[in-house]
């Protein structure tokens, strides 16, 4: 990740108003958020559904980051420095939480000493859920309201339906949200179900690459799904 990318990330247009900060990877904000390569994240279209005279929508997601690396690279600290009581933080991770840089699997309190492949330094590695809890607790400590989203699905078809990732990031996100008592939007299942209904031909137009990054139409579709997911919550914080 570009260690100076956060300097170019947006700030609240009207600092006196409450702000909704978006935290995540390139499926939320791709590159500079300008449609480079035809790719757009859903966070670029979410402001269309809010009254921007009453709330800021600030897309601070960074491509290539995961639940641990967004913390370790200082992107989260740059947000908490701006958080104030009455703000909201919407968090979606999982697409970059595999391989050598992945946290430990699960949501428990296990930890291991690991060598960071980027820095070569040794340090403790926690579970995926442990890291997600840090966002929730630090947001609350600032008087902000966290909202957890499961990761949007990849375009992988299996037996005519979008493949779900069982016992993985989507389920862990739900479990942590329930344990911490925060709002949860199951984007993984909600969008997958909508893709199933629409079918492969139309869904193909929603993607700018083979299976992960969305086109403008796909990002707009996913932003609408975020809003739909919020609207059906028993206690919608927004």
Regions found by a protein language model. Give the residues of each.
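Alpha-helical cap/lid subdomain in secreted, periplasmic
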Residues: 75-216, 220, 224-236
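Short clusters of hydrophobic/aromatic residues that line enzyme substrate/ligand-binding pockets
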Residues: 28, 70, 206-207
């Amino acid at each position: 990740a570009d260690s100076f990318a956060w300097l170019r990330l947006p700030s609240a247009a009207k600092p006196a108003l409450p702000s909704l900060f978006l935290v995540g990877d390139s499926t939320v904000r791709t590159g500079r958020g300008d449609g480079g390569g035809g790719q757009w994240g859903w966070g670029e279209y979410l402001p269309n559904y809010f009254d921007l005279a009453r709330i800021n929508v600030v897309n601070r997601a960074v491509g290539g980051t995961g639940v641990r690396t967004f913390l370790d690279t200082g992107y989260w600290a740059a947000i908490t420095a701006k958080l104030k009581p009455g703000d909201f933080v919407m968090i979606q991770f999982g697409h970059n939480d595999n391989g050598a840089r992945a946290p430990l699997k699960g949501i428990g309190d296990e930890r291991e000493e690991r060598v960071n492949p980027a820095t070569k330094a040794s340090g403790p590695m926690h579970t995926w859920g442990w890291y997600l809890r840090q966002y929730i607790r630090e947001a609350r400590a600032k008087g902000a309201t966290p909202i957890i989203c499961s990761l949007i699905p990849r375009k992988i078809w299996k037996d005519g339906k979008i493949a779900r990732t069982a016992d993985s990031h989507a389920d862990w996100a739900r479990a942590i949200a329930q344990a911490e008592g925060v709002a949860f939007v199951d984007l993984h299942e909600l969008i997958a179900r909508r893709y199933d209904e629409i079918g492969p031909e139309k869904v193909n137009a929603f993607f700018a690459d083979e299976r992960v990054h969305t086109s403008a139409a796909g990002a707009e579709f996913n932003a609408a799904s975020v809003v739909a997911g919020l609207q059906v919550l028993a206690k919608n914080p927004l």
